[in-house]
């Protein structure tokens, strides 16, 4: 059987893998398991690392996961109306045509503080589990 990284590389290269790597994508489960709130782990990255690494170890996932879910979409698409015609500021449900894509604002890394925290968390996760793949999920504006 393929190892975690071998299977991932095969999948990313469009090749056949004999297994599908499984990761923890829902941050709320690890956070709840450790008794923290989302606000706490967002403000204290070491708590997020504790939750994600500990849950991976306990449940045997094939890697660690981090994500930037709202910062990017808010920044580049929060000004656009959703399918109900409302501007709610979250950037969700706003891309319905090529014209909508043209209305996206430029993304500025320095205006997204969560990215800096993510770099730190990747460093900490690598310290804790040097052999585990780390998957970074970036949420983009959606239809």
Feature-to-residue mapping (PLM):
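Catalytic cores of TIM-barrel enzymes
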Residues: 1-143
